[in-house]
């Protein structure tokens, strides 16, 4: 006989306790567990035997479960006999192998979906039967039947722990998991953190990733109406703690949550400086509620993605998109971006045209390219990569004429005349092709590196594992973490010594004004400018590489007004002067980049000014007072030299022109009037 109890053929039965055992009987009843410990007979390596005594039926169950785990199977409570109210109460219990019985055949019901679930039951006859004995007022349970013959393979010790009966999540671990979920980390990351905390090898926790997902899913299965109420209460709670937090929502005819949008104080402050170009990513859904999720993001002066706002919509129709855009511009004090980049969505396109008529709408190229494999891979086959390379070449061309000719040749070469995706791409070319977009500011968000950073930033919001009400908190955690990381990155960049490559006064001046990130972009153009020659013509300059005999870019420069422009339109597109314009400035003995070509959005911004502005953001009167103080300081500082005065006059004129383009409210006029009366 084998020493392994799991492989022994043991069948014991007490003839004095003969009752039939049908493992197909599913009418088992489970009682509440008792707190009694195992009897002294239940030593670790013990095997059940006839006549074995237990104080309670739960103690017997624990003993048999320990034996089963050691053997390589698990058990379940099967059937009880002598139930309360029938006579003597509960008198007999059966514990069986988890593979006992057979799966009943379900009848197919028309119109009802059937779950294709596999069963592990195979008619195994292994069991333990215990009977209740009462003597002299004392109750105990005695083993009256035991069989350890299995008709299936038993599991190894490293396998048996995966059986559901031996997997459990303690209350302490549940609390940790729910706390982790609020931070938005993935289930895999939760598992790894718990493994490190408990000092166990990977995969040796008493539960699996599936158990964690089921736990988190159980917290989502709430009444949708309760979810909506909790979500709105959460937003209101945040609003009470932070008055600068903003949110808007709509209810349908049944008073159920239809749409909701929100933004944080730090996001609104960032938008004031960096909201000129915005990505509105609407390609994701929030799994907790299966609602389309829209996220507004941008890029700050250090080239780091920054969060502007979120929206959840029930439907993706024109009405919903219009509401979302109205809510967003409302958060941002009516200021619409210069450029907004989105996925290809006709309803969204129409909504942008209606709600943001002065905003340039463009398509995110990485969202478009992400659909290419499903659109073209099958049709082009081995030629797909060649076609994709040609597409990128056309995408980066500088002139519309070159693009149009190249596109026609590409369609002919690859035989794509009847391809509907090619036709749709061509019809929307003004929304994604760089030759059509170079005159619009995109803050470099079409670059591959920048798009990857933005996409990675957005993914941080999509790992939310818990309820809808927690999602707004999770987003806040990610935003706060990103803000802190950005501040640290900003400090590190500012502490680094900037290496000047040309030694030109223009370079050192730009280095003192721009952030290290922005300066590195301008510095690239400054270095390249030395390789270009400029030729003065009747209308401006012609600039081309010193090795070229023809072609080039046309540069127009008006020194008296400090205005310069180039036909390559790099400044209009990215906010950095191009090599061609810098070459002309150098030729004209200009030792500083004109201030208007060092945009505020790429400059080093005073932290103290930013904080002062934030603290006064809610009180209109205080903001007017702050502005008056700034103007007074501006006048006193500008009067110290002619150069300072010239700069102040020029920049103030530009600022006034921009201000006069903005709408005026009657409330603001009254506040200004009262403020002026108080101060004069």
UniProtKB/Swiss-Prot annotation:
Keyword Zinc in record: yes
GO BP: regulation of DNA-templated transcription
Zn finger (SWIM-type) location: 556-589
Induction cue: Up-regulated in hypocotyls by far-red light treatment.
Signal peptide: none
Keywords attached to this entry: Metal-binding, Nucleus, Zinc, Zinc-finger
Record-annotated MULE domain positions: 277-373
Function: Putative transcription activator involved in regulating light control of development.
Name of the featured protein: Protein FAR1-RELATED SEQUENCE 11
Organism of this sequence: Arabidopsis thaliana (Mouse-ear cress)
């Amino acid at each position: 006989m084998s020493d392994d109890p799991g492989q022994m053929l043991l069948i014991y039965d007490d003839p004095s306790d003969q009752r039939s055992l049908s493992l197909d009987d599913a009418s088992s009843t489970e009682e509440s567990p008792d707190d009694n410990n195992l009897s002294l007979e239940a030593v670790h390596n013990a095997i059940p035997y006839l006549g074995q005594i237990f104080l309670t039926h739960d103690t017997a169950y624990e003993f048999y479960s320990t034996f089963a785990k050691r053997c390589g199977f698990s058990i379940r409570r099967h059937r009880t006999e002598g139930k309360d109210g029938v006579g003597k109460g509960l008198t007999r219990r059966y514990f069986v192998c988890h593979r006992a019985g057979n799966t009943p055949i379900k009848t197919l019901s028309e119109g009802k979906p059937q779950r294709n679930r596999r069963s592990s039951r195979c008619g195994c006859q292994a069991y333990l039967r215990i009977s209740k004995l009462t003597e002299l007022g004392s109750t105990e349970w005695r083993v009256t039947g035991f069989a350890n013959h299995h008709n299936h393979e038993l599991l190894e010790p490293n396998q048996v722990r995966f059986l559901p009966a031996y997997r459990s999540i303690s209350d302490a671990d549940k609390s940790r998991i729910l706390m982790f979920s609020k931070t938005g980390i993935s289930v895999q990351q939760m598992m790894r953190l718990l493994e490190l905390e408990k000092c166990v090898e990977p995969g040796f926790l008493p539960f699996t990733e599936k158990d964690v997902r089921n736990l988190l899913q159980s917290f989502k299965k709430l009444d949708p109406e309760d979810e909506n109420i909790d979500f709105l209460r959460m937003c209101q709670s945040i609003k009470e703690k932070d008055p600068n937090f903003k949110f808007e929502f709509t209810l349908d005819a049944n008073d159920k949550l239809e749409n909701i949008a929100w933004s944080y104080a730090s996001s609104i402050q960032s938008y004031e400086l960096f909201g000129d170009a915005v990505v509105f990513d609407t390609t994701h859904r929030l799994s907790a509620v299966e609602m389309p999720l829209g996220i507004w993001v941008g890029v700050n002066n250090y080239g780091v993605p920054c969060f502007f706002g979120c929206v959840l919509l029930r439907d993706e129709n024109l009405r919903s998109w219009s509401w979302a855009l109205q809510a967003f511009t409302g958060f941002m004090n009516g200021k619409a971006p210069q450029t907004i980049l989105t996925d290809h969505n006709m309803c969204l396109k129409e909504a942008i045209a209606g709600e943001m008529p002065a905003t340039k709408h463009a398509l995110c190229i990485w969202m478009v390219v992400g659909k290419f494999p499903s659109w073209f891979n099958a049709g082009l086959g081995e030629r797909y990569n060649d076609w994709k390379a040609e597409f990128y070449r056309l995408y980066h061309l500088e002139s519309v004429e070159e693009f149009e000719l190249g596109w026609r040749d590409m369609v002919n070469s690859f035989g794509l005349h009847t391809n509907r995706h090619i036709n749709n791409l061509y019809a929307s070319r003004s929304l994604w092709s760089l030759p059509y977009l170079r005159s619009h500011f995109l803050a470099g968000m079409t670059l591959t590196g920048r798009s990857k950073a933005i996409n990675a930033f957005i993914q941080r919001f999509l790992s939310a594992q818990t309820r809808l009400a927690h999602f707004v908190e999770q987003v806040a955690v990610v935003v706060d973490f990103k803000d802190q990381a950005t501040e640290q990155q900003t400090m590190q960049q500012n502490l680094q010594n900037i290496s000047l490559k040309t030694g030109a006064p223009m370079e050192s001046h730009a280095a003192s004004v721009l952030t290290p990130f922005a300066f590195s972009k301008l510095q690239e153009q400054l270095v390249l400018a030395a390789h270009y020659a400029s030729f003065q013509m009747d209308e401006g300059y012609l600039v081309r590489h010193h090795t070229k005999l023809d072609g080039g870019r046309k540069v127009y420069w008006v020194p008296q007004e400090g205005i310069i422009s180039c036909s390559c339109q790099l400044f209009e597109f990215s906010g950095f002067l191009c090599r061609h314009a810098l070459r002309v400035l150098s030729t004209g003995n200009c030792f500083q980049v004109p201030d208007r070509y060092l945009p505020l959005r790429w400059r080093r911004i005073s932290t103290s000014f930013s904080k002062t502005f934030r603290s006064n953001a809610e009180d209109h009167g205080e903001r007017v007072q702050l502005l008056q103080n700034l103007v007074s300081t501006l006048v006193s500082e500008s009067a110290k030299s002619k150069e300072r005065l010239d700069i102040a006059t020029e920049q103030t004129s530009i600022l006034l022109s921009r201000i006069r383009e903005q709408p005026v409210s009657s409330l603001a006029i009254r506040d200004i009037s009262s403020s002026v009366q108080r101060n004069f």
